[in-house]
């Protein structure tokens, strides 16, 4: 029995290696087949290019066939996963999925601005259960809300500072407060209602938002849960985690925040320095979970260091995470499943029906109507 378990674990690891390879080959082959036609002087290379594309497709099919064969064989004798017997994860919902405002509801108002938070908080048409937002550290060690690595897309930073790729780490919080964070927000009618606002004409709720300020604002209004992602990696990311931890602990919010990051070194730092923080699975952990779920492996209750999967429903048409099998397997191990970024009404309804615990959407108003009503 022990040897059988070891063999299963090895095959699971092999699958987790093959899966990214399949995705990579598939993506590259799609790009190769969709490339524009070469000019006349490149015509001699067309035939060899087609042959290469066919070879790539052949490799993909071969890998898939091998995986399917292994999977089918294992499913015949792999033991079923056990059921978690400890304290129930509060983020696992018994009925409908929770509604999470992605980037504070960036499809309704300018993302990650106080105006967006206020729009969700004060709405009489829908309620928000979870606020999702992203953080970057500034030059003076403040945490501000921003999704991208630079301020170029959402603000007038390029115009104001005179160069491109403006990053928060290169400027103080006071300097970033001079920017218009609603500059490039496009309303549903196609207009840009906040474009061109400068200086004193920029309202306070369209300026850079400090972590402490948004938490205090929300907590004064009601009791919410939060999904907070640190975007920085390396030392900046670790320093950002320390600041975030202190802010949350001071306000008694550690149990209402699920922390996330795409940086492996930051995940390891959280596990080592702040093990009492709730967190979502990292990229490699999601791949391992996916392999274990497909094989229905029987794992120990303490096999997972994370409390939630924050994942897309489908990735590259190959990795299908938005299935009832994935949700049920996660729930067996007391792991909540929260899907991003889901804006399509039909997909919202489908994921809610399979038991998703949260729908993270740019349009929480639409998600609420579908899920709650």
Q: Model-found features: residue ranges?
A:
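Phosphate-group recognition and catalysis centered on beta-loop-alpha active-site segments
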Residues: 43-373
């Amino acid at each position: 029995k022990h040897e059988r378990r070891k063999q299963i674990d090895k095959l699971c690891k092999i699958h987790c290696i093959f899966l990214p390879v399949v995705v990579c080959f598939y993506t590259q082959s799609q790009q190769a087949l969709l490339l524009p036609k070469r000019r006349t002087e490149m015509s001699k290379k067309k035939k060899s290019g087609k042959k290469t594309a066919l070879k790539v497709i052949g490799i993909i099919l071969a890998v898939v066939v091998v995986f399917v064969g292994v999977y089918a064989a294992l499913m015949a004798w792999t033991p079923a996963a056990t059921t978690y017997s400890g304290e129930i994860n509060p983020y696992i919902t018994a009925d409908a999925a929770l509604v999470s405002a992605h980037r504070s509801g960036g499809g309704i108002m300018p993302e990650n601005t106080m105006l967006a938070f206020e729009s969700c908080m004060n709405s009489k048409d829908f309620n928000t259960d979870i606020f999702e937002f992203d953080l970057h550290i500034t030059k003076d060690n403040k945490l501000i809300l921003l999704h991208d690595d630079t301020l170029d897309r959402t603000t007038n930073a390029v115009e104001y500072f005179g160069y491109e790729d403006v990053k928060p780490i290169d400027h103080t919080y006071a300097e970033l407060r001079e920017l218009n964070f609603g500059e490039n927000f496009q309303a549903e009618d196609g207009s840009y209602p906040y474009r061109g606002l400068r200086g004193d004409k920029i309202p306070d709720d369209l300026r850079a938002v400090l972590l402490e300020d948004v938490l205090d604002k929300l907590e004064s209004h009601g009791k919410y849960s939060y999904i907070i992602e640190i975007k920085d990696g390396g030392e900046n990311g670790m320093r950002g985690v320390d600041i975030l931890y202190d802010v949350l602990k001071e306000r008694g919010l550690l149990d209402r925040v699920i922390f996330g990051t795409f940086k492996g070194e930051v995940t390891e730092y959280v596990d080592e320095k702040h093990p009492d923080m709730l967190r979502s699975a990292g990229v490699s952990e999601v791949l391992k979970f996916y392999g274990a779920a497909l094989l229905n492996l029987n794992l120990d209750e303490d096999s997972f260091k994370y409390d939630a999967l924050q994942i897309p429903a489908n990735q590259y048409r190959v990795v299908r995470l938005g299935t009832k099998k994935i949700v049920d397997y996660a729930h067996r191990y007391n792991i909540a499943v929260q899907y991003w970024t889901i804006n399509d009404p039909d997909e919202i309804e489908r994921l809610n029906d399979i038991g998703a615990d949260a729908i993270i959407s740019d349009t929480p108003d639409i998600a609420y109507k579908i899920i709650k009503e």
